[in-house]
Amino acid sequence: MKKISVLGSTGSIGKKTVDLLLKRKEEYQVEALSTCSNFALLACQAKLLNARYVAISNKRFYKDLKESLLGTGIKVEVGTEGLMNVASLPVDLSVVAVVGIAGLEPVMHVIESGTKVIALANKESIVCGGKLLLKKTEEKNVQIVPIDSEHNAIFQVLQNGNKCVEKIILTASGGSFLNYSLEQLRNVTVGQALSHPTWNMGKKISVDSATMMNKALEIIEAHNLFNISPNRIEAIVHPESIIHGIVIYKDGFNFAVLAEADMAIPISYALSWPERSALSYKLDLTKQKLTFQEPDHKRFPALKLSMEVLNSSSPHTNSIVLNAANEVAVDKFLKSRIDFLEIIKVVKLTVENFDSYTDINSLSDIINIDLESRAIAKEIIKNKVLAYS
């Protein structure tokens, strides 16, 4: 049996992972599960999967979790330290589905633990960790298998390396507002942004999809993860979300990965890698249409911004700044403190106003840049978006 941990087991990716593990209980021994604050669901998952450890980051719910697991023998860890403790458990496979930059430190602990495969759903770890994180995976001989459907697709095609690759293409659904005019985008609501046409996702990533910042972050992730220059990475809009990634080779051949739009498929691949496990999903192309279009950079400027970041003199630092500012702006949008179109404006202004450039040699360097960027973004929102102060 494979020993496995699932960090962020109560989020959208985590729940899908748990569903798959429940169907494959004879294949996996669940060592640890974690959540930020959803103690009730975590306790239920831990009992169903006979987990050895659980961790809850929010100390406020420690007592509730402890009481929910009385008599089970399941060990409870709490706070940031508790999360790092379970991240440090040596397992065969660790699924990291913690949302945002909060996932970076646990990933670093997983790498140091002796775990050999990380099924990674946290793109921010690659975006912000950059070469520092990837160098550490090489030193420790750790394989990252991406769960993001686009990077999972590219990963599958590039199993023999990226030699002779001309370009990689990441597909984007276009999000909730693909066909909205610029004028319509000025008045969209939080509820509308969370109603994704093809994917069932969490709040933050649904908003990122609507602004196309999700794809902007994925471009940076692809650059770092696959060691491919920015000018060889392209994003196109594919509303049906059937083709997840395309690799174009120098001889003119194009390799595309097709699958239904359900995260259970790339999660299953990551769980089973380097093998494959049977799933009931059967794609019938006779009942599908495949359409493509260029992204509209005027309505969705995030893609252009990510390329500017990658082509800047300090791409690693600016990637951290971009991610931090976006997390702040999305949070304010979800709280109705700023409008939809102001999300990317805040991000762009934060990148433009950040000037504390230093070498990035440690996790603390990344965290310091992240914190300073958040402070700048919050100040921009306070001063520029006066209607919401």
Swiss-Prot record:
Cofactor names: Mg(2+); Mn(2+)
GO molecular function, one term: manganese ion binding
Binding residue positions for 1-deoxy-D-xylulose 5-phosphate: 123, 149-150, 173, 196, 209, 214-215, 218
Keywords of the record: Isoprene biosynthesis, Manganese, Metal-binding, NADP, Oxidoreductase
InterPro entries named among the record's database cross-references: DXP_reductoisomerase (IPR003821), DXP_reductoisomerase_C (IPR013644), DXP_reductoisomerase_N (IPR013512), DXPR_C (IPR026877), DXPR_C_sf (IPR036169), NAD(P)-bd_dom_sf (IPR036291)
Any GO BP annotation: isopentenyl diphosphate biosynthetic process, methylerythritol 4-phosphate pathway involved in terpenoid biosynthetic process
Keyword Metal-binding on entry: yes
Presence of keyword Zinc-finger: no
Binding-site residues for NADPH, renumbered to this chain: 10-13, 38, 122, 124, 202
EC class: oxidoreductase
Gene3D superfamilies associated with the record: 1.10.1740.10, NAD(P)-binding Rossmann-like Domain
Disulfide bond annotation, renumbered to this chain: none
Positions bound to Mn(2+): 148, 150, 218
Domain of life of the native organism: Bacteria
Catalytic activity, as annotated: 2-C-methyl-D-erythritol 4-phosphate + NADP(+) = 1-deoxy-D-xylulose 5-phosphate + NADPH + H(+)
Pathway: Isoprenoid biosynthesis; isopentenyl diphosphate biosynthesis via DXP pathway; isopentenyl diphosphate from 1-deoxy-D-xylulose 5-phosphate: step 1/6
Protein family membership: Belongs to the DXR family.
Name the record gives this protein: 1-deoxy-D-xylulose 5-phosphate reductoisomerase
Organism field: Wolbachia sp. subsp. Brugia malayi (strain TRS)
Biological classification of the source: Bacteria, Pseudomonadati, Pseudomonadota, Alphaproteobacteria, Rickettsiales
